[in-house]
A protein has these predicted regions:
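PAPS-dependent sulfotransferase catalytic domain
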Residues: 1-181, 243-248, 252-288
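Poly-acidic low-complexity segments
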Residues: 35-37, 120, 189, 206, ...
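PAPS/PAP-binding and catalytic site of the sulfotransferase fold
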Residues: 17-31, 181-205, 213, 221
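A residue-level detector for conformationally permissive "hinge/kink" positions
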Residues: 9, 194, 237-240
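PAPS-dependent sulfotransferase catalytic core
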Residues: 214-264
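Hydrophobic alpha-helical segments and their boundary regions
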Residues: 6, 206, 234-237
């Protein structure tokens, strides 16, 4: 039996830079002039919610409101995804790396490694709210819900859980080769950040290719693509997928109470990953 440990997961909570990362990697690795636009990223990466793979795994069109049916078909769909290319390849996921109802959502026997992207929850909350067509308080509730899920119209799901549990599930997964990238570091020090990622992939960085890939996938250019071409991955009801692409928007978009709630829920994880925000958010919450 052939070794199917071919998937390099591009994992994140929604609105944490996954599309940006997929675009950047496509622009770096694909031949000049052949990198796909944002609506054709599936030419370079796959996703674990692809309807065609679930249909094939189900031996017919997959559609079900039941989590049990999704769990029944998912392992077969992931095996098909893993075997769809001869070597290692990137697969997007928003699922936690956990056992769910006795099943590994990220099967070790199909996994070569993972790139995990995270974004500070203060900026994530308003962006996630737009993604969910919800108000910010509702988005924060979902970020705090251990049972939070998203799904396609046909019932192919993303098991999100809480924001902090999501991070923990990936960065503490036993035996998983992983590399963690902060959204904020991509904004402020992209060349250095991507070089670290490429070295994790055992790829010697090419400075010229890297500079071109970073320029081609700047937030301004991705937003321009969405304006000109639309974006097929944008959820119904969401006006724009690429809204601001900045760090620190929480200062203008969150109330003191919302900042306090996020701090209260996620403080240990903030201390680990965003210590630079602790004092400012503490003062902001008190000032309300």
């Amino acid at each position: 039996m052939s070794d199917l440990r071919r998937i390099i997961w591009l994992a994140s909570y929604p609105k944490s830079g996954n599309t940006w990362m997929r675009s950047l990697l496509a622009n770096y690795f694909m031949p000049p002039g052949q990198a796909p636009d944002i609506n054709n990223l599936r030419r370079f990466t796959t996703a674990d919610v692809r309807q065609d793979f679930f249909d094939k795994a189900n031996s017919g069109p997959f559609s079900s409101p039941n989590v049990a049916d999704w769990l029944r078909v998912r392992p077969k769909a992931l095996a098909l995804i893993a075997g769809s290319k001869p070597g290692t390849h990137f697969v997007k996921t928003h699922c936690q790396a956990v056992r769910y109802e006795g099943q590994d959502l990220i099967p070790p026997q199909l996994t070569a490694g993972a790139i995990y992207m995270l974004r500070n929850p203060f900026d994530l909350a308003p962006s996630f709210a737009r993604h969910q067509s919800a108000d910010i308080d509702t988005a924060i509730e979902r970020m705090c819900n251990p049972d939070a899920m998203m799904g396609t119209d046909t019932g192919i799901r993303d098991a999100l859980g809480r924001w902090d549990d999501h991070i923990r599930s990936w960065v503490e997964a036993p035996g998983l080769p992983r590399h963690v990238v902060r959204y904020e570091d991509m904004l402020t020090q992209a060349p250095q950040t991507v070089r670290g990622l490429l070295k994790f992939l055992s790829v010697e960085p090419n400075s010229a290719k890297l500079a071109k890939a970073i320029k081609a996938t700047s937030f301004k250019n991705l937003k321009k693509q969405e304006e000109e071409l639309g974006f097929t991955e944008r959820p119904d009801g969401m006006k724009t997928f690429f809204a601001k692409g900045q760090a620190g928007v929480w200062r203008d978009e969150l109330t003191a109470g919302q900042v306090a709630r996020i701090r209260e829920e996620f403080l240990p994880t903030l201390e680990n990953w965003y210590p630079e925000l602790l004092e400012e958010t503490k003062d902001f919450a008190k000032a309300g």
